Amino acid sequence: MNKLIIALILLFFFLGQSVRGQEDNIKVSLMTCAPGTEIYALFGHTALRYEDKARGEDWVFNYGMFSFNTPHFIYRFVKGETDYELGVTRYPYFEGSYAMRGSSVYQQTLNLTISEKQELRRLLEENYLPENRVYRYNFFYDNCTTRARDVIERCIEGKVVYSEGKEGLSFRDIVHQYTKGHKWDELGIDMCLGSEADKPIDARKQMFAPFYLLEAAKKATIVVGDSVRPLILHEKKVVDAEPENVGDGFPLSPLACVFILIGITCFVGWLQFKTRKIIWIWDLLLFGVQGLAGCVITFLVLFSTHPTVGSNWLILLLNPIPLIYLPIMVCRAIKGKKDLYHTINVVYLTLFIMIMPFVQQKFNVTVLPLALCLLICSANHVLLYYRQNNKCCLLYTSD
């Protein structure tokens, strides 16, 4: 009888040690990578690391895999139909790639039970099945960071509770935090985002950005009944690096370029006023670029499934109308016919500039001077017509 009791005690002891050893051997971590210099890397990256020392496994699960070689990649990206997929790589390769590009990597070890770790592995393996690994990417709502957060929450038996995020932040505010020093990239993104991107968002929506998830995870807790434990056991920087500061690769900022355009437009207007002749090449360039940019924005507003782009008030300034009307304008001028385009454009652009402060959208700093540039160009034509006809009339006929 005593031998049986001793045997049972030893059995339970070794079973406990086995389970404890199994738990100690498995470690799951949230990996947050610092921003890189390429536009697709400006916001950083998130991945999951799964370590099982007993099996010699050390894998990184990455929901941010995509290929530029995908057929019609640019068109699909603009339309909001880009597909990303879950990729798996060995940790040393993952660490080395970020060290090579100069991006620091932070590791937050998750405070999970053995059953939760096993469930997380099962979910990741299920996600990695060929029929499950590909997903439709959404920059704000379904990306590599939100996917990592969601799969962590799914494996936890209780509930993850986050602290409140920063008040008053919008998607555009967070984007601007990551585009500092990259003014041309910031301009391109700003031109695409509409007024919806300027609405305040809650803590959960702020987690689309990798470092916002990192900060949220630090303060998060796991609640199971009356039990509360921190989500993160500990954090460390596994790659300490600084990216090469390459900036935009262009010496002039967008704002400087727009002011140069204003200067050239004023000079062209002076030449036209002095010679009483229209310099058409400048009109073709200025209104052509306005129309082409307008085609892109109109396409985004009407056809793209990207979030926040459908409410873009910038379409009032940048639309295809100048590009469509430009040939008509030139033909009417050559035939000596009257044309009200520039007169209407002066009134229209004046009204646009006046309503800008009241529109619930944060325009890029280049928008106002750009509108002024286009206004000056049209005003030059109106003044030239007045000079040519020597009377107070806001119609013009070209020579």
Where in the sequence are the language-model features?
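Extracellular structured ligand-interaction cores
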Residues: 45, 58, 107-109, 145, ...
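Activation targets extended, charge/polar-rich intrinsically disordered C-terminal tails
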Residues: 126-394
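Conserved small/polar residues in nucleotide/adenosyl-binding loops
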Residues: 396-399
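Boundary at the C-terminal end of the N-terminal hydrophobic targeting segment
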Residues: 19-23
